[in-house]
Structure formats: structure tokens, C-alpha cells
Amino acid sequence: MFRLFFFMIISLLSLQTMAEQVIVVLGDSISASYGMPVEQGWVSLLQKKLLTQHSRYSLYNASISGETSAGGLARIDVLLNTQKPAIVLLQLGANDGLRGLSPLDMKSNLEEITRRTQNIGATVLLLSMKIPPNYGKRYVDLFYNVYPQLAQQLKITLVPFLLEDVALHKDLMQADGLHPNAKAQAILADKIEPYLLPLLQ
């Protein structure tokens, strides 16, 4: 009887080990399927790709259109406590730049989000963004350099400019010139996938 009970405990622990792992996507409109149905967005497309190879991972999309790094920082604790993610895809900063907010404050916010995530044993995948040159070269350079600086400082994986293969192609952008359209979403999913796969256990 004891052996049977012991076997059941071991089996339950094994099942728990194989339990579903959550990947939280913390982003802005780029990740929130802005201007299209949710199922057409890159997060949904990436989830479908993962299901074919890594079925125990599910994506939880916590992205909000208009979100800033400060907004993400204000929400991260609740997300970590409720979702208990294994990985956080951090795609924030673009709205900080578009509003002319301090790149130093943005860096501080992203750093704190990353540290809090790492403190629970989760991994951060940082998605870098760029902004139009409206605020001048110095501001744009300060903004963009935040991402590689953080990646090096915190030893996290960095996805180069997410919209690199999309932003300059009008047929892949919405009319506002800022948001990728539905045709571009598969490109974004394909861009992220090779950086994400090595992080999956």
C-alpha cells in the first residue's frame, strides 16, 4: 500500500513538471493586434507555431495599445503573481519614444521589469524598437541604445529591431505608417521564433 502511494506521489510530481508553462507577452499595440482581429496578430501566430513543437508552452498576451514602459512596470507584479510565467517577452518603449519621454526613465523602467521577472526565476526576451527621427538624432540614438545596453547589462537575449523587415515596406504597414498590417504578422512571428526557441526548456 505504501509503495502504491509513493508511486502515485512520484507520478503526480512528474505530471506537474510537465505542466503547461506560460510565456507572457508584455507589449504595446505592436503586440496587441492593433487594427486587426486578435487571431491574426503575431502572438497568436507564434502560439500556433509553438504548438507543433513545444505544446506545453502557452502565450498569455498582456499587451495594451498605447502602453509605456511605466505602464508595464505598474502591471508586472500582478502578471508575475497571477500567471507565474517561465518567460516574459518584453516589447515596450515605442510609446515612450513617440511621446518624447526620457530614455533614461525608459531604461530604468525596463530594467526594473526585467529584474522583478528574474527574481521569480523567469527569463526575459527583450524586443527592441525604433522610432521616427522627429526628436532629432541624439534623442533617437539614446532611445535605441537602451535595448543593447540593457541586454548586455542584464545578460538577456535581445531581438534586434522587431520591425526591421516591415517598417519600410508600405504594403506591410497600416495607413498610419506606424503599425504593421495583417500581412506583416507572420514576418514578426518568424523574426521572434529563433530567439525564443533556445529559451524553451
How should these model regions be labeled?
Residues M18-S65, R75-K84:
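Serine-esterase "nucleophile elbow" of acetyl-processing enzymes
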Residues S14-Q16:
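N-terminal signal peptide c-region/cleavage motif recognized by signal peptidases
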Residues F5, E20-I23, S55, K183, ...:
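Catalytic-site microenvironment of enzymes
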Residues A32, T68, P133:
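Flexible, glycine-rich phosphate/dinucleotide-binding loops
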Residues L73-Q201:
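Alpha-helical cap/lid subdomain in secreted, periplasmic
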Residues F2-M8:
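Sec-dependent signal peptide recognition
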